[in-house]
A protein has these predicted regions:
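N-terminal auxiliary segments of SAM/dcSAM-dependent transferases
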Residues: 1-39
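Conserved alpha-helix/loop element of class I SAM-dependent methyltransferases that forms part
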Residues: 43-47, 60-78
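Class I SAM-dependent methyltransferase SAM/SAH-binding core
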Residues: 81-139
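A short acidic, Gly/Pro-enriched loop at the edge of an enzyme's catalytic core
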Residues: 138-149
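A short glycine-rich, Lys/Arg-flanked "PGG" loop and its adjoining helix->strand segment in the class I
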Residues: 163-178
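Short, glycine-/aromatic-enriched active-site segment of Class I SAM-dependent methyltransferases
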Residues: 184-204
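Short alpha-helix
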Residues: 205-221, 227
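Conserved Class I S-adenosyl-L-methionine
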Residues: 226-291
Length: 291
């Protein structure tokens, strides 16, 4: 039998490490925006709790329910050791710890996101259950077989080396563990011009197709339990997200400047429209580590 050919993405735009960091450092969803939302809560003398943040710290397609779905599909419970890969400002990590009682480690490449995640986690009293580490997802600082569950949401589109990423997930996960993630994927209609522009404007690198992900996961010892095409659902969600971001235009301008606000709107509009042309799509994959 011929050796299985590994997925090798065509990198239309290979970005320096700091480009992705800069992208998230100037993101409309940021510490300032979240702190303003907290101040607007009418808590009176009530202490800030994790659920108070759920309305605005779940920066993922489908919001809280999408995060809950990953937890349910991975059969998360109080005994689970969970790794959130590309954890951002930590909303899902806090949700998992609060709702399921598990211990969660979040890793993110962007230090400002990690610091915000730590601050918010301290504010809601979950620092004993949730830890955040600055780390490259392709070189994780963990021992072999350290986690039962690995989750991620719409972040691996920024990582060019999908093979090494999945290899690291396999290494740090114990046999029988579950990987549950969602990501932005390309469809056959995606043109080189589109992918290059998304690389420059959205810092997407080496976008995989659904079949690419399945191939990589199986190569690294995972058995696919679910690979759901979310393209149609996300096409609807993203139109609403664009409206949400436009509602933050004044705050984005105040924090990052008018030029960045205009640049973001142009880039995100183009991104959202690629779902209408079906050049881009979404996937939710659940896989068990079998070897």
């Amino acid at each position: 039998m011929p050796e299985q050919k590994m997925f090798q993405p065509r990198i239309h735009t290979r970005l320096p490490d700091n480009t992705v960091i800069q992208y998230y450092d100037s993101h409309p969803i940021n510490e300032s925006q979240i702190m303003d939302a907290i101040k607007s809560l009418d808590l009176r003398d009530e202490p800030l709790r994790p659920h108070h943040l759920f309305a605005f710290d779940q920066d993922h397609f489908g919001g809280l329910e999408a995060t809950r779905t990953l937890a349910q599909l991975s059969q998360m419970n109080a005994e689970s050791a969970v790794l959130d890969v590309c954890s951002g400002v930590g909303g899902p990590s806090r949700f998992f710890a609060d709702q399921y009682g598990c211990r969660v480690t979040g890793i993110d490449f962007t230090e400002t996101r990690r610091k915000t995640a730590i601050k918010l986690t301290e504010m809601v009293g979950l620092s004993d259950k949730v830890t955040f580490i600055q780390s490259d997802a392709t070189e994780m600082p963990f021992d072999n077989n350290e986690f039962d569950i690995i989750v991620a949401q719409e972040a691996w589109c920024h990582i060019s080396d999908k093979n090494q990423l999945i290899s690291e997930c396999s290494r740090v996960m114990g046999t029988g563990g579950t990987l549950a993630f969602t990501d932005i994927v390309k469809h056959d209609a995606a043109t080189d011009r589109t992918l290059e522009r998304l690389g420059h404007e959205m810092t997407f690198q080496g976008l995989a197709s659904i079949n690419d992900y399945v191939s990589i996961l199986e190569h690294h010892g995972f058995t696919i339990k679910e690979a759901s095409d979310l393209t149609d659902e996300w096409a609807r969600i993203l139109v609403k997200r664009l409206e949400m971001y436009r509602g933050l235009e004044q705050k984005t301008t105040a924090v990052h400047g008018e030029a960045r606000a205009i640049e973001w709107d142009r880039a995100y509009s183009f991104f959202v429209n690629r779902y209408q042309t079906r050049e881009l799509g979404g996937v939710r994959i659940v896989a068990n580590k079998s070897t």
